[in-house]
Amino acid sequence: MLQVLPADAAELVEQGGVIAYPTEAVYGLGCDPDNDEAINQLLQIKQRPWQKGLILVAGDYQQLLPYIDESQLNAQQLAFAQSKWPGPFTFIMPVKPGLSKLLSGAFDSIAVRVTAHAGVKALCAAIHKPIVSTSANLSGQEPALSPLAVKQQFEGIISGLVVGELGSQASPSTIIDARSGTVIREG
């Protein structure tokens, strides 16, 4: 399996590849959020139904603006989300009209996060946008916690593995509905 630095992984992503990369807690699988073919490939690899939707992880809040509909959130709701970022908080936000259903699934919202993980920030900076993020595992199995676990599940299936360390989070991010403030999953 090709092992690459974040800057080199950007080329794989821009070419429509699916990559694995370390995040705050587990390895993730990711691709270009503007490439439906790549998103379909990721969903097939993971054996995940498109209806569930996916998470976008960004290096900064500005990268999320083409994907979320801020007009459906009030100043308090936006300020609350931004007060938690960068960090291990994923917010469910209204989706911008016209966004691919492969990202939002069967919902009128999308899960988004601004990462504090240096490697993911570097990757997002290199591709100039957020990256699709879902845990590196087949649907229903435990997420990969090491490069070896990624290789065992995805050798010959994904385009590359980003070299780096997992962050210090013991569990995946907390998920909060930005409109209601309801915690959907404790991290």
From Swiss-Prot:
One of its GO terms (molecular function) is ATP binding. Pfam families: Sua5_yciO_yrdC. It catalyses: L-threonine + hydrogencarbonate + ATP = L-threonylcarbamoyladenylate + diphosphate + H2O. Residues 3-187 form the YrdC-like domain. InterPro entries: DHBP_synth_RibB-like_a/b_dom, Sua5-like_dom, TC-AMP_synthase, TC-AMP_synthase_SUA5. It is found in: Cytoplasm. It is an enzyme of class 2 (transferase). GO terms for cellular component: cytoplasm. It comes from the Bacteria. Its main location: cytoplasm. One of its GO terms (biological process) is tRNA threonylcarbamoyladenosine modification. Its EC number is 2.7.7.87. Keywords: ATP-binding, Cytoplasm, Nucleotide-binding, Nucleotidyltransferase, Transferase, tRNA processing. Required for the formation of a threonylcarbamoyl group on adenosine at position 37 (t(6)A37) in tRNAs that read codons beginning with adenine. Catalyzes the conversion of L-threonine, HCO(3)(-)/CO(2) and ATP to give threonylcarbamoyl-AMP (TC-AMP) as the acyladenylate intermediate, with the release of diphosphate. PANTHER family: SUA5, THREONYLCARBAMOYL-AMP SYNTHASE. Belongs to the SUA5 family. TsaC subfamily. This is Threonylcarbamoyl-AMP synthase. It comes from Shewanella pealeana (strain ATCC 700345 / ANG-SQ1). The gene is tsaC.
